Structure formats: C-alpha cells, structure tokens
C-alpha cells in the first residue's frame, strides 16, 4: 500500500543543534519545531524566561551566559542578528569548523521541502502569520508554523504540523529573508526601518523586497498590499503572479462596509473570479488588522480553502500575545481603567494603535506609557515619534530600550520628552525606570481612562506587573 504519511527529509549528519540566544522571539520557535522533529537541541541565553523554561521542559538543554563550552557536541550553531560576531560560542564554533548559520537559513531548511507561506513586511507580520496558521488549522490542514509572538489559541509561537504547509514570518531587518524559498509570499507594507542593514538607502530596501519575491518559483504567487504606496510602486518590478489586497477599489481582494465597536471590527471581503463576498467579524480593533485579515483571505482563496473555514477561523481568532492584548479593567479611585499592552515600536504602528483606540473607544481618555526601542530607530524616526506620540492625552515616556546598542546623544528618552513638550500639545512625564511607572500613574489615572503600555523592550513586563498588582 502507498505510504501517505509525509515527513521532511532529515538533515544529514546533524544530530545536535545549538542556538545562541535561544530565548529570542525568532529563535525559540525554530528550536521548538526541530525539537519536535527529534533533533537534540541545546541553547544559551543571558537570562531565564518563560520561553527558555518551556523549551527546557520539552527536553532542550539550556545554559545561561555565553561560553565556548556551551557548544560541546553541536553539529551546527544557529545565531540571530542580535548575536555579536565575537560571541565566545560563535568564535569557538568557527575555530572548531562547526557551521555557524543565521536563523533564517535554518528556517529555510525547514521550508525547503514544504509548501511555504512566508509573511514579509515592516508591520503586521506576526498577526498575519498567526491568522494564516489559524485558517489553515481550521481547514484541517494542520500546518507547521513559526511566529514571532505567542498565538493565544495554541499557547505557543511554534508548532510542528503533519501537513506540507509551513507558515512563517520573513524577516527583512537583516535581509535574511532572502534565504527563504516559499511557494507563497505576502508583503504587508514597506517602511523605513532597520535602515542600517541597507546602508540608509531606501531604494536598496525596496529592491531587496523584489529580490525576496523573486525567490518564489515561477508558479508561486506574491500577495501584496495595494494600499501601501511603496508596495504598490514595486508591483511592476515583480516577475511573478501577483494578487493585491486593500481598501482601494483597484485591489483584487478588498474590504468594504467596515465598522468598529470596541474590540470588534467587522467588514465585507470582496473577491475576484466569482467568489462570493465574505462577512467577517474580527476580535481585533483597527483598520490595520482588516488589512492583515485581507492578506490571509487572498492566500486562502487562492489555495482553495473552503469559505466556511476562512470565516470561522477569522471570527474565532483570539489574538497574539502583546498585540493589543487587553488585560481587563482595573480599579482606580472612584472608578476603573482599561489596561492594554502592545508591541508596536515604529511610529506607523503607534499611530495605527492610537487610531484603533480612538475609533473603538472614542469617549475614553488615552493614557500611554511608551518605551522607545533602539537608539538608531529613535534617531532615524525622531520627528515621526514626536508627531505621533503627541496624539495621546497623557504620555509617560520611558528611556530607550537599547537592545544592545550604544547610546546616541540626542536620541534618548529625555530628548524625545523635551521635543514633545516643545511641540506644545501635551506635557509628557519622563521616567528612567520601569518600576516607577505605577507610582507616576497613580497621580494621573482617572475613571474611564484607557491605559496603553507600548514598546518592543521590557515594557511588556511592566504591563504584566501592573496587571498582577493592580493600579492602586
């Protein structure tokens, strides 16, 4: 009888795989999938986290701190762009002629024998990848997925599935997404971020996205957001089949009749080729999430997935950790405050979140605690940050989370605070330490406020502490 159970070929000679920085959002998912495929996994990180504990419980051998001894027995060493070239584990691997590869190269190996769906773009990758994995799962296709955030319904950011489908984020931050060879590629948007990778040349960034799309086979498909002006600009350069999506009437898959009420955003998706309209009700606020859902509808329709599965998965979607994560309502003097935590760290992401809050909760005063992420990003997008952060009602500004970078004069939290104050729309409060947030908030919060903690650094832990200990 013909064997219908499919499994990817094993990597020859590879038994033990070591991850430097295994707790990172891009690393832990790949490690988990490989662990479930039967490989021995070891890894190192600077400190313990919920992620490292989960991997340890699954059988990974994890050490804290970086030393040459950590790579003992490894056949390959996987690193991310956050790992320094002179890291002692990387140095030892090079000396011992153990291959050292980028995380995207290992992801590419996982994708090579699968039907890969790669989600690229400056913003929206994690949510779109999560929605895509949920739709495939609802259709009974049991995908493997690797996501940069925790998919709430699965309780994890990675899973080894039984089918040929693999859904993953494609990271442009270090141009490593060029390693990937998917069957379907989505581009959500293209914005000026991680410009150090591209020598400050925006044209080079755009061309790199085109090169990424040309990694598709000639029978592959590029799914591109028509509403994003930069994505729209590069469409004529793409020598593959293209499906567009957006609010624009010229988009192939488009949304009409959009309505938002609190967390609920409903819309009608119109599709080409005689496909019936789909009425969707997302448990996520904001038009940016409608675009994320449209990308998934475009892919799912092209893949021949049943409409019932598409609608059901999108309507049931429970969100992703730290993507507009609502902790709930917490008592304050004479009332209560709604606490929301979000990962947004680029001015465009912050702006999208503010718009979603204004549309969904127009009566609420918006109190934001924002932590800038990276000195280079703060410097490069300084005026954009000043403009967008001036749109909230009350702003508590933390100092920059360095993410390994050296301080850049004039691109720190104090300077940003001063510039926002000089703009004259509000008087921000600057704090140096996360542990001071609660005390500062006690003097500003009022009944009915929406409290937003936002940033890609350790501010997520601040939100967790506030949720656990309350706001009083």
From Swiss-Prot:
What's a GO biological-process term for it? Answer: cell wall organization
Q: Which subcellular locations apply to this protein?
A: Cytoplasm
* Binding-site residues, ATP: 121-127
EC annotation? 6.3.2.8
Q: What InterPro entries does its record include? A: Mur-like_cat_sf, Mur_ligase_C, Mur_ligase_C_dom_sf, Mur_ligase_cen, Mur_ligase_N, MurCDEF_pg_biosynth, UDP-N-AcMur_Ala_ligase_MurC
User: In what pathway does it function?
Assistant: Cell wall biogenesis; peptidoglycan biosynthesis
Instruction: Give the source's domain of life in one word.
Output: Bacteria
Q: Which GO terms describe its molecular function?
A: ATP binding; UDP-N-acetylmuramate-L-alanine ligase activity
Q: Which UniProt keywords apply?
A: ATP-binding, Cell cycle, Cell division, Cell shape, Cell wall biogenesis/degradation, Cytoplasm, Ligase, Nucleotide-binding, Peptidoglycan synthesis
Q: Which GO terms describe its cellular component?
A: cytoplasm
Write out the function statement from the record: Cell wall formation.
Q: Which family does it belong to?
A: Belongs to the MurCDEF family.
Q: Which named protein is this? A: UDP-N-acetylmuramate--L-alanine ligase
Source organism (scientific name):
Hahella chejuensis (strain KCTC 2396)
Q: Which gene encodes it?
A: murC
């Amino acid at each position: 009888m013909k064997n219908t159970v499919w499994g990817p070929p094993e990597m020859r000679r590879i038994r033990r795989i070591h991850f430097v920085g295994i707790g990172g959002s891009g690393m832990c998912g790949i490690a988990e999938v490989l662990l479930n495929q039967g490989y021995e996994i070891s890894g190192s990180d600077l400190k313990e986290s919920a992620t490292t504990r989960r991997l340890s419980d699954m059988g990974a051998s994890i050490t804290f701190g970086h030393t040459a001894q950590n790579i003992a027995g490894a056949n390959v060493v996987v690193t991310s762009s956050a790992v320094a070239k002179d890291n002692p584990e990387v140095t030892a691997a090079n000396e011992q002629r153990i291959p050292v590869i980028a995380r995207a190269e290992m992801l590419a190996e996982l994708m090579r024998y699968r039907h890969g769906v790669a989600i690229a773009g400056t913003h929206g990758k994690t949510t779109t990848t999560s929605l895509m994995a949920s739709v495939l799962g609802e259709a009974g296709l049991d995908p493997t997925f690797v996501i940069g955030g925790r998919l709430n319904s699965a309780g994890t950011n990675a899973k080894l599935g039984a089918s040929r489908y693999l859904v993953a984020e494609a990271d442009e931050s270090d141009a490593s997404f060029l390693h990937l060879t998917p069957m379907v590629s989505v581009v959500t948007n293209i914005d000026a971020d991680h410009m150090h990778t591209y020598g400050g040349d925006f044209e080079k960034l755009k061309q790199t996205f085109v090169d990424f799309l040309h990694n598709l086979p000639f029978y592959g498909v590029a799914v591109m957001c028509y509403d994003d002006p930069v994505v729209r600009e590069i469409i004529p350069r793409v020598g593959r089949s293209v499906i567009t999506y957006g609010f624009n009437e010229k988009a192939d898959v488009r949304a009409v009749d959009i309505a938002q009420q609190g967390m609920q955003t409903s819309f009608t998706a119109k599709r080409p080729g005689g496909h019936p309209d789909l009425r969707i009700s997302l448990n996520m606020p904001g038009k940016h999430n409608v675009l994320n859902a449209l990308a998934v509808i475009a892919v799912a329709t092209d893949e021949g997935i049943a409409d019932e599965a598409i609608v059901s998965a999108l309507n049931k979607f429970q969100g992703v950790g730290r993507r507009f994560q609502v902790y709930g309502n917490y008592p304050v003097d004479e009332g209560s405050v709604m606490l929301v935590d979000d990962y947004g760290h680029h001015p465009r992401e912050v702006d999208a979140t503010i718009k979603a809050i204004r549309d969904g909760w127009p009566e609420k005063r918006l109190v934001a605690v924002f932590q800038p992420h990276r000195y280079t990003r703060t410097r490069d997008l300084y005026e954009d940050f000043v403009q967008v952060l001036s749109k909230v009602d009350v702003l508590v500004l933390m100092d920059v989370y360095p993410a390994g970078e050296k301080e850049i004069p004039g691109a720190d939290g104090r300077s940003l605070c001063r510039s926002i104050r000089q703009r004259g729309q509000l008087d921000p409060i600057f704090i140096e330490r996360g542990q001071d947030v609660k005390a500062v908030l006690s003097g500003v919060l009022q009944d009915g406020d929406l409290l937003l903690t936002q940033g890609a650094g350790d501010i997520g832990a601040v939100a967790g502490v506030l949720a656990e200990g309350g706001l009083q």
